[in-house]
Amino acid sequence: MQLPDESIKEFQALYEKEYGQKLTWEEAREAAQNLIDLMEVLMEGDIKEKKRQNRLKTEPKGFPMEGGPYSCCVCRQSVPDEQTWYDKNGIKCLHCQRAVDKRLIPAYVCKNHDTWYSMWEFDFYFKIKSATILKFVRQGKLKMRIVPNASGGIHERLFLIKDNHGVLPHKPRSRWVPTEGNRTTLEYEKVPFPLLET
């Protein structure tokens, strides 16, 4: 979609007012176009989500997805559409869906990622390798929930903060920090990990 000149001028004025910096015509045109493209993607996603929500009214237990691949809201793996399930808790792979159905993991983990850790997050947030975490599990210091795969092996490991009260800290909060050259980087707060302090 070609932006009218009036819209580009308006964007330049808004940007200068908000950030105190003038944009060239080309910078303003590109930034405004990027904003419109983003809005189109968001609207398209919202329309798809509303259609899914309406379909749930006739299929309240959920349904398989079409038009994938999709990312599972629990394990975050990319899954082909025939191996996904959508219900009131969101899009899940069939392994995670079965784990929710069998109450191996609570349904709230689908939408509230701040209430649990996956194995990779220990390394990401605390620089603790999975071997150390599994040692804590064997020693009974950490409780782990397992999402099994179809053959009974391990598909995903979850560590609920609720199951490990007083042992697992809340998830570190993030913030954008300015760096050189008008750029920003994402930083996480430092949160102590109690099992390493004993």
Locations of regions flagged by a protein language model:
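Short helix-start
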Residues: 94-102, 143-177
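Short cysteine-rich clusters marking metal-coordination/redox-active sites
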Residues: 72-75, 93-96
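Polyanion-binding surface elements
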Residues: 110-136
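Flanking scaffold residues of small Cys/His-coordinated metal-binding clusters
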Residues: 66-67, 87-88, 114
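Short linker/helix segments within small regulatory modules
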Residues: 82-91
